[in-house]
């Protein structure tokens, strides 16, 4: 392949990357994407795109290197060839590790979560705000649990939406909002008193 062909391929790759970045950037806003308040609405999707671009770029380097090395392989390459592949792969993963040092998941207060242990710890912390009053003295949690099992598992089980409920609603203090939605469904059978009891149990125990 001559230099002219190489130049065309490089130009095609760069142009495709720019087009992909523009589409990614546009779609992120069309889907209603909103980053955390302390993050830039412009830089955040661009950084995500750069992560994918680096992954593809490093993979391309590996393929290019293997192609060039395969034409010069001899009996003396039995050790240097696999070592070269190992070095290229390690450079790729280290570069991605440095790029994503802050983590892929960001909380609303700007903190980063990198591991499942950190995510579990975050979910177990009590919410900063709540639209549900604290449980009164002598509150019967066992009876409340039975009420929740009867009223709140008609359309789907609570376990099937547990992660969504805990991360999107309970953590943001919107438990009562979900209870009111369930109460509004035809045939829910949830009275106002039931709604208060269910809300307290969901906030305290679920």
Swiss-Prot record:
GO biological process: photosynthesis
GO cellular component: plasma membrane
Compartments it resides in: Cell inner membrane
Pfam families: Cytochrome-c551
Family matches, as SUPFAM superfamilies: Cytochrome c
Post-translational modification: Binds 1 heme group per subunit.
Residues that coordinate or bind heme: 152, 155-156, 182
Record's subunit section: Monomer. Component of the photosynthetic reaction center composed of protein subunits PscA, PscC, PscB and PscD. The reaction center interacts with FmoA (which forms the Fenna-Matthews-Olson (FMO) complex). The reaction center/FmoA complex has two PscA subunits, one PscB and one PscD subunit, probably two FmoA complexes and at least one PscC subunit.
Repressor keyword on record: no
Gene3D superfamilies referenced in this protein's UniProt entry, alphabetically: Cytochrome c-like domain
Record membrane topology: Multi-pass membrane protein
Residues annotated as transmembrane: 10-30, 49-69, 76-96
Protein name per the record: Cytochrome c
Originating organism: Chlorobaculum tepidum (strain ATCC 49652 / DSM 12025 / NBRC 103806 / TLS)
Functional summary from the UniProt entry: Monoheme cytochrome which is the immediate electron donor to P840 of the photosynthetic reaction center complex.
